[in-house]
Protein backbone atom coordinates (compact mmCIF):
# COMPACT_ATOMS: atom_id res chain seq x y z
CA UNK A 1 0.00 0.00 0.00
CA UNK A 2 2.83 2.30 0.71
CA UNK A 3 4.26 1.89 -2.78
CA UNK A 4 0.86 2.43 -4.32
CA UNK A 5 0.23 5.53 -2.25
CA UNK A 6 3.69 6.74 -2.96
CA UNK A 7 2.81 6.90 -6.67
CA UNK A 8 0.25 9.60 -5.95
CA UNK A 9 2.35 12.10 -4.04
CA UNK A 10 1.80 15.67 -5.07
CA UNK A 11 5.45 16.66 -5.10
CA UNK A 12 6.39 13.85 -7.47
CA UNK A 13 3.61 14.46 -9.93
CA UNK A 14 5.93 15.98 -12.51
CA UNK A 15 8.33 13.05 -12.41
CA UNK A 16 5.48 10.58 -12.67
CA UNK A 17 4.12 12.49 -15.64
CA UNK A 18 7.48 12.30 -17.44
CA UNK A 19 7.93 8.78 -18.89
CA UNK A 20 11.70 9.26 -19.23
CA UNK A 21 12.28 9.92 -15.51
CA UNK A 22 13.79 7.26 -13.20
CA UNK A 23 10.84 7.49 -10.81
CA UNK A 24 8.43 6.67 -13.63
CA UNK A 25 10.55 3.73 -14.78
CA UNK A 26 11.12 2.28 -11.22
CA UNK A 27 7.53 2.65 -10.06
CA UNK A 28 6.20 -0.79 -8.96
CA UNK A 29 2.54 -0.01 -9.65
CA UNK A 30 0.62 -1.91 -12.31
CA UNK A 31 -0.06 1.20 -14.36
CA UNK A 32 3.61 2.10 -14.56
CA UNK A 33 4.64 -1.48 -15.32
CA UNK A 34 2.14 -1.71 -18.15
CA UNK A 35 3.27 1.62 -19.49
CA UNK A 36 6.93 0.61 -19.27
CA UNK A 37 6.22 -2.67 -21.04
CA UNK A 38 4.38 -0.82 -23.80
CA UNK A 39 7.26 1.60 -24.18
CA UNK A 40 9.73 -1.29 -24.38
CA UNK A 41 7.65 -3.01 -27.06
CA UNK A 42 7.41 0.19 -29.06
CA UNK A 43 11.16 0.77 -28.84
CA UNK A 44 11.91 -2.82 -29.97
CA UNK A 45 9.46 -2.48 -32.86
CA UNK A 46 11.09 0.78 -33.91
CA UNK A 47 14.52 -0.86 -33.89
CA UNK A 48 13.20 -3.63 -36.15
CA UNK A 49 11.81 -1.00 -38.46
CA UNK A 50 15.12 0.84 -38.49
CA UNK A 51 16.97 -2.41 -39.25
CA UNK A 52 14.57 -3.39 -41.99
CA UNK A 53 14.57 0.15 -43.34
CA UNK A 54 17.85 -0.08 -45.31
CA UNK A 55 16.61 -3.06 -47.36
CA UNK A 56 13.40 -1.23 -48.18
CA UNK A 57 15.37 1.90 -48.86
CA UNK A 58 17.65 -0.07 -51.15
CA UNK A 59 14.65 -1.58 -52.90
CA UNK A 60 13.08 1.83 -53.34
CA UNK A 61 16.43 3.21 -54.46
CA UNK A 62 16.83 0.39 -56.98
CA UNK A 63 13.26 0.93 -58.14
CA UNK A 64 13.79 4.65 -58.48
CA UNK A 65 17.12 4.09 -60.26
CA UNK A 66 15.55 1.55 -62.62
CA UNK A 67 12.61 3.86 -63.23
CA UNK A 68 14.97 6.78 -63.81
CA UNK A 69 16.99 4.59 -66.20
CA UNK A 70 13.84 3.62 -68.01
CA UNK A 71 12.77 7.23 -68.14
CA UNK A 72 16.16 8.17 -69.49
CA UNK A 73 15.98 5.46 -72.13
CA UNK A 74 12.45 6.44 -73.07
CA UNK A 75 13.45 10.10 -73.27
CA UNK A 76 16.50 9.18 -75.31
CA UNK A 77 14.37 7.01 -77.57
CA UNK A 78 11.86 9.80 -77.90
CA UNK A 79 14.51 12.43 -78.40
CA UNK A 80 16.21 10.55 -81.22
CA UNK A 81 14.27 11.30 -84.40
CA UNK A 82 12.79 8.31 -86.12
CA UNK A 83 14.05 7.71 -89.63
CA UNK A 84 11.60 8.65 -92.31
CA UNK A 85 9.99 5.71 -94.06
CA UNK A 86 10.73 5.15 -97.70
CA UNK A 87 7.28 6.55 -98.55
CA UNK A 88 8.14 9.90 -96.92
CA UNK A 89 11.39 10.32 -98.77
CA UNK A 90 11.08 13.39 -101.03
CA UNK A 91 13.15 11.64 -103.68
CA UNK A 92 10.73 8.75 -103.54
CA UNK A 93 7.84 11.21 -103.84
CA UNK A 94 9.53 12.83 -106.82
CA UNK A 95 10.05 9.46 -108.46
CA UNK A 96 6.42 8.58 -107.77
CA UNK A 97 5.25 11.87 -109.25
CA UNK A 98 7.43 11.39 -112.32
CA UNK A 99 6.17 7.83 -112.72
CA UNK A 100 2.58 8.97 -112.38
CA UNK A 101 3.16 11.73 -114.90
CA UNK A 102 4.77 9.25 -117.28
CA UNK A 103 1.93 6.78 -116.73
CA UNK A 104 -0.70 9.47 -117.29
CA UNK A 105 1.08 10.71 -120.43
CA UNK A 106 1.40 7.14 -121.68
CA UNK A 107 -2.27 6.43 -120.98
CA UNK A 108 -3.15 9.73 -122.67
CA UNK A 109 -1.08 8.72 -125.67
CA UNK A 110 -2.83 5.34 -125.72
CA UNK A 111 -6.23 6.98 -125.46
CA UNK A 112 -5.44 9.38 -128.30
CA UNK A 113 -4.72 6.58 -130.85
CA UNK A 114 -7.82 4.77 -129.67
CA UNK A 115 -9.85 7.90 -130.17
CA UNK A 116 -8.27 8.51 -133.54
CA UNK A 117 -8.95 4.90 -134.54
CA UNK A 118 -12.55 5.15 -133.37
CA UNK A 119 -12.92 8.47 -135.20
CA UNK A 120 -11.42 6.92 -138.32
CA UNK A 121 -13.73 3.93 -138.00
CA UNK A 122 -16.73 6.18 -137.55
CA UNK A 123 -15.63 8.31 -140.50
CA UNK A 124 -15.04 5.24 -142.64
CA UNK A 125 -18.38 3.86 -141.51
CA UNK A 126 -19.99 7.17 -142.36
CA UNK A 127 -18.28 7.23 -145.75
CA UNK A 128 -19.20 3.59 -146.32
CA UNK A 129 -22.76 4.29 -145.24
CA UNK A 130 -22.92 7.25 -147.60
CA UNK A 131 -21.48 5.13 -150.41
CA UNK A 132 -23.93 2.36 -149.64
CA UNK A 133 -26.77 4.85 -149.57
CA UNK A 134 -25.57 6.35 -152.83
CA UNK A 135 -25.26 2.90 -154.39
CA UNK A 136 -28.72 2.03 -153.14
CA UNK A 137 -30.10 5.26 -154.55
CA UNK A 138 -28.37 4.64 -157.88
CA UNK A 139 -29.68 1.07 -157.94
CA UNK A 140 -33.17 2.28 -157.15
CA UNK A 141 -32.81 4.92 -159.85
CA UNK A 142 -31.65 2.26 -162.30
CA UNK A 143 -34.51 -0.02 -161.32
CA UNK A 144 -37.00 2.78 -161.68
CA UNK A 145 -35.49 3.73 -165.04
CA UNK A 146 -35.61 0.14 -166.23
CA UNK A 147 -39.16 -0.22 -165.02
CA UNK A 148 -40.10 3.02 -166.71
CA UNK A 149 -38.35 1.95 -169.90
CA UNK A 150 -40.09 -1.44 -169.83
CA UNK A 151 -43.43 0.22 -169.24
CA UNK A 152 -42.73 2.73 -171.97
CA UNK A 153 -41.67 -0.05 -174.35
CA UNK A 154 -44.88 -1.94 -173.58
CA UNK A 155 -46.84 1.20 -174.22
CA UNK A 156 -45.00 1.72 -177.49
CA UNK A 157 -45.61 -1.89 -178.55
CA UNK A 158 -49.26 -1.61 -177.67
CA UNK A 159 -49.57 1.63 -179.55
CA UNK A 160 -47.74 0.12 -182.52
CA UNK A 161 -49.90 -2.98 -182.48
CA UNK A 162 -52.96 -0.81 -182.28
CA UNK A 163 -51.67 1.30 -185.13
CA UNK A 164 -50.88 -1.82 -187.20
CA UNK A 165 -54.33 -3.22 -186.56
CA UNK A 166 -55.84 0.11 -187.43
CA UNK A 167 -53.74 0.25 -190.57
CA UNK A 168 -54.79 -3.26 -191.55
CA UNK A 169 -58.43 -2.46 -190.95
CA UNK A 170 -58.04 0.71 -192.92
CA UNK A 171 -56.30 -1.29 -195.62
CA UNK A 172 -59.16 -3.74 -195.79
CA UNK A 173 -61.65 -0.94 -195.85
CA UNK A 174 -59.67 0.84 -198.55
CA UNK A 175 -59.28 -2.36 -200.49
CA UNK A 176 -62.98 -2.95 -200.33
CA UNK A 177 -63.77 0.62 -201.17
CA UNK A 178 -61.14 1.07 -203.87
CA UNK A 179 -61.61 -2.44 -205.28
CA UNK A 180 -58.03 -3.62 -204.87
CA UNK A 181 -56.60 -6.98 -203.77
CA UNK A 182 -56.00 -7.03 -199.98
CA UNK A 183 -52.88 -9.14 -200.33
CA UNK A 184 -50.95 -7.14 -202.93
CA UNK A 185 -52.95 -3.89 -202.85
CA UNK A 186 -53.12 -3.69 -206.65
CA UNK A 187 -56.06 -3.13 -208.89
CA UNK A 188 -57.75 -5.85 -210.80
CA UNK A 189 -57.00 -6.24 -214.46
CA UNK A 190 -58.12 -8.49 -217.22
CA UNK A 191 -54.90 -10.37 -217.01
CA UNK A 192 -55.25 -10.77 -213.22
CA UNK A 193 -58.99 -10.79 -212.57
CA UNK A 194 -60.89 -10.59 -209.28
CA UNK A 195 -62.16 -13.71 -207.48
CA UNK A 196 -64.82 -13.35 -204.75
CA UNK A 197 -65.25 -15.90 -201.97
CA UNK A 198 -68.46 -16.90 -200.23
CA UNK A 199 -67.33 -14.93 -197.21
CA UNK A 200 -67.60 -11.88 -199.50
CA UNK A 201 -63.83 -11.23 -199.68
CA UNK A 202 -62.16 -10.74 -203.08
CA UNK A 203 -58.59 -11.37 -204.18
CA UNK A 204 -56.49 -11.58 -207.31
CA UNK A 205 -56.64 -14.96 -208.94
CA UNK A 206 -52.88 -15.38 -208.85
CA UNK A 207 -52.73 -14.15 -205.25
CA UNK A 208 -55.41 -16.55 -204.04
CA UNK A 209 -53.69 -19.47 -205.79
CA UNK A 210 -50.46 -18.65 -204.06
CA UNK A 211 -52.34 -18.36 -200.74
CA UNK A 212 -54.09 -21.68 -201.18
CA UNK A 213 -50.72 -23.39 -201.53
CA UNK A 214 -50.09 -22.43 -197.88
CA UNK A 215 -53.60 -22.45 -196.34
CA UNK A 216 -57.23 -23.11 -197.29
CA UNK A 217 -58.61 -20.47 -194.96
CA UNK A 218 -59.45 -16.93 -195.88
CA UNK A 219 -56.57 -14.57 -195.11
CA UNK A 220 -59.06 -11.96 -193.89
CA UNK A 221 -61.62 -13.82 -191.77
CA UNK A 222 -60.01 -17.25 -191.42
CA UNK A 223 -62.97 -19.23 -192.81
CA UNK A 224 -62.68 -21.98 -195.38
CA UNK A 225 -62.54 -20.37 -198.74
CA UNK A 226 -65.28 -21.09 -201.24
CA UNK A 227 -65.31 -19.18 -204.48
CA UNK A 228 -67.97 -17.49 -206.47
CA UNK A 229 -66.50 -17.04 -209.87
CA UNK A 230 -67.68 -13.93 -211.67
CA UNK A 231 -67.40 -13.45 -215.47
From Swiss-Prot:
Its EC number is 2.3.2.27. It is found in: Cytoplasm. Keywords: Cytoplasm, Metal-binding, Transferase, Ubl conjugation pathway, Zinc, Zinc-finger. The lineage of its organism: Eukaryota, Viridiplantae, Streptophyta, Embryophyta, Tracheophyta. One of its GO terms (molecular function) is zinc ion binding. SUPFAM superfamilies: RING/U-box. It comes from Arabidopsis thaliana. Pfam families: zf-RING_2. This is E3 ubiquitin-protein ligase At3g02290. A zinc finger (RING-type) spans 181-222. It is an enzyme of class 2 (transferase). Residues 103-118 have a biased composition (Basic and acidic residues). CDD domains: RING-H2_AIRP1-like (cd23116). The RING-type zinc finger domain mediates binding to an E2 ubiquitin-conjugating enzyme. The keyword Zinc applies. Pathway: Protein modification; protein ubiquitination. GO terms for biological process: protein ubiquitination.
Amino acid sequence: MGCVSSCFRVEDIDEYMNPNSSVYRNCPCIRCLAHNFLNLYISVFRRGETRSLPSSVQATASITSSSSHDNFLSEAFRSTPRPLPYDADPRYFRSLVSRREKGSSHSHEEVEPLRSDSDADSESFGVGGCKWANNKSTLSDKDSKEEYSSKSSLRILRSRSKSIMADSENMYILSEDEDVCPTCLEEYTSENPKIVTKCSHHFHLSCIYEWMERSENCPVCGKVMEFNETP
